[in-house]
Amino acid sequence: MKITKAEVDAVALLARLELTPEETETFTGQMDAILAYVEKLNELDTSGIIPTSHAVPVENAFRDDAVRPSIGVENALANAPDRVEGFFRVPKVIE
């Protein structure tokens, strides 16, 4: 499968990228090479291979939830440059 410049332009549009003609030419060649590699992988016989999502067997290791003491409001606000009624005061950033 050959990638066309129009397809590269379409992908660039979806990614909101503005490409120069030289970049379009470069990416056309690079995407062609990638697809050629994928086509080569499709030639492999994988009929006896079990589908996996990880190369090694990995499982999540969860810990039990435990209640622990927190640092407290006063300690949390101790170094705050500005606070009011037990809260951090920050500059307004949204009008």
Swiss-Prot record:
UniProt-recorded Gene Ontology molecular function terms: asparaginyl-tRNA synthase (glutamine-hydrolyzing) activity; ATP binding; glutaminyl-tRNA synthase (glutamine-hydrolyzing) activity
TM region positions: none
Disulfides per UniProt: none
Keyword Protein biosynthesis (UniProt): yes
Keyword field contains ATP-binding: yes
Keywords: ATP-binding, Ligase, Nucleotide-binding, Protein biosynthesis
Xref: InterPro entries: Asp/Glu-ADT_sf_sub_c, GatC
Protein family (similarity comment): Belongs to the GatC family.
Assembly information from the UniProt record: Heterotrimer of A, B and C subunits.
Protein name: Aspartyl/glutamyl-tRNA(Asn/Gln) amidotransferase subunit C
Organism, scientific name: Geobacter metallireducens (strain ATCC 53774 / DSM 7210 / GS-15)
Gene from which this protein is expressed: gatC
